[in-house]
């Protein structure tokens, strides 16, 4: 290993670099320098040969110079006493007759990250902007942006900006593109580079001479120009027409976006453009590059929001291949759902049916949900397939089919009879809470059509004590009461037993309150129960299942060829906000927003909870409520990221802890009653980047320590440590209140 005996290695290399016989042999000399670079990249400190490496730069060998420049840029900040020697060497090479040497030296100078280096690189950069060699001008233009970054918050050099604007007329196309990039960086605080009519027309005329990367860049900058007349607009569109046929997907997408933005007043032109890019998009969807394929599929879905069925004739292009990754398969299934019509429905359903038995449970469930979405239009065919899937008696398939049936009978009442005939016997293959809730809901609402409905619910009642999900218990209460109204003789006894358990023994307050509500409602009379439970009502989630209206192209044209179709508009806005602004300390809500009958937390302790230690990048989002089912599902799917114990003595009121947690935006999902043992609490919180923290607090009988278990949906050690710090502060504050 080179790390052992490193001093001997440095001495050996230093001796070799000073050997005149090696210096006389160019290949041997270069090989020694390559050894220095190799050891440097392996982590060995090679700063001891700095002087010898600077001397090695005095050569006509371009390869050797490049290696030495790499070394000097790496170690110059670590050797400030010798860095000036390196700068002088580079400045000298900036005047070398060879343009490759001049450009290489200038690029290396701009890469130095040292205080005060600006005064040394300014004049070489200005000279480079006027150099006859295009390669040197390319490097000098990019060096302007680097020099501006080194200056920090100093004022923008107007003369330098004017020089860069004049270089937009340069004969070298790469210099032009580099000028745009540098101006954008330098003028970032002023809104970026300004594209006026002369610049826009000049760039349009030079487009054919640019490489594909440059074309994509220029198309993005041209979005800032607004034509003055309709005639000018169509002249620009005619110039851009050929780029819709480019072999580069980036150029095609950039040209398409520019077309959509410029033609915002001409919907027929927008539609024609989207028809013309159908071929390139389909080719990208079949690309071997998985990243390109995924992004293309996201853009296809975006286009389908405005042009439903736009790709219907090419539906087979979206059939999934066995070797494709999971995320691409899910996108293709979503697209297939939107391409179904009378001509291809049978083929699409057969394809989706094959996916339902995929080895990936998540993909199989997504395919079943997709069939459920198609069932709103082609009900009979889809219900038949879903019924056949129930016969497979596989837990993950049965669970999703029952959930799909629940949504289907709600939206398509005509299929209720077929669904009710398919349900008997499926309860044996349902174990998770979502499937149980869906089945119980169906038995409660349509139990009069299902012969064994009371007996299935009776099994749930008998096992209610071992049921761990409060949402299942609440659904069971409602379903059994509904079924009691239509089949009272079979349900009266078990309803009484369930109400007794929920009121007298259940520890979850939400379940207990619902049991009390139904008990008191029954005391009022059956007519009142029917009026409340069986009255016509609309569910708030109905809007999620209805067909979304077609969106005009202009509503998403500005998001085309960006990451918005990939992340979603809201999520991307959050990411952009975090990238654009430095993280600030979390701003906690004021305690006055939480109403309480009495001071659960003394004012001095409230101030302590609010004045938490700096949590770095952590900023918990207020009012982030999770359902118990979602919490449970996520909790079971994640591994414990952190565990610890905190000292704990005596009793406390749970409301005190809940109040303190709310102050710091940590929500309580469920909590045991005061004094119960073991005592548990489940908490959730989410930061502004979407990282979710799920927490379990546990107090065992006779134990003087509180056990804390935290799970995280994204592995971020820094934010996890910040969250633990906040949690420790809250619990420590409550401990002081008790004492």
From Swiss-Prot:
Give the range the annotation lists for the signal sequence: none
- Please give the name of this protein: AP-4 complex subunit beta-1
Family annotation (InterPro entries): AP_beta (IPR026739), AP_complex_bsu_1_2_4 (IPR016342), ARM-like (IPR011989), ARM-type_fold (IPR016024), B-adaptin_app_sub_C (IPR015151), Clathrin/coatomer_adapt-like_N (IPR002553), TBP_dom_sf (IPR012295)
Disorder this protein is connected to according to its UniProt record:
Spastic paraplegia 47, autosomal recessive: A form of spastic paraplegia, a neurodegenerative disorder characterized by a slow, gradual, progressive weakness and spasticity of the lower limbs. SPG47 is characterized by neonatal hypotonia that progresses to hypertonia and spasticity, and severe intellectual disability with poor or absent speech development.
Provide the species name.
Homo sapiens
- Described function: Component of the adaptor protein complex 4 (AP-4). Adaptor protein complexes are vesicle coat components involved both in vesicle formation and cargo selection. They control the vesicular transport of proteins in different trafficking pathways. AP-4 forms a non clathrin-associated coat on vesicles departing the trans-Golgi network (TGN) and may be involved in the targeting of proteins from the trans-Golgi network (TGN) to the endosomal-lysosomal system.
For this record, an example GO cellular component is:
trans-Golgi network
Q: What is the lineage of its organism?
A: Eukaryota, Metazoa, Chordata, Craniata, Vertebrata
* Keywords assigned: Golgi apparatus, Hereditary spastic paraplegia, Membrane, Neurodegeneration, Protein transport, Transport
Report TM segments.
none
For whether the record's keyword set contains NADP, the answer is no
Q: What is its main location?
A: Golgi
The annotated topology with respect to the bilayer is:
Peripheral membrane protein
Pfam families the UniProt entry points to: Adaptin_N, B2-adapt-app_C
Location of this chain's protein in the cell: Golgi apparatus, trans-Golgi network membrane
Chain residue ranges for the region called Ear? 601-739
Q: Which GO terms describe its molecular function?
A: clathrin binding
GO biological process terms, semicolon-separated: intracellular protein transport; protein localization; protein localization to somatodendritic compartment; protein targeting; vesicle-mediated transport
Q: Could you say which protein family the record assigns here?
A: Belongs to the adaptor complexes large subunit family.
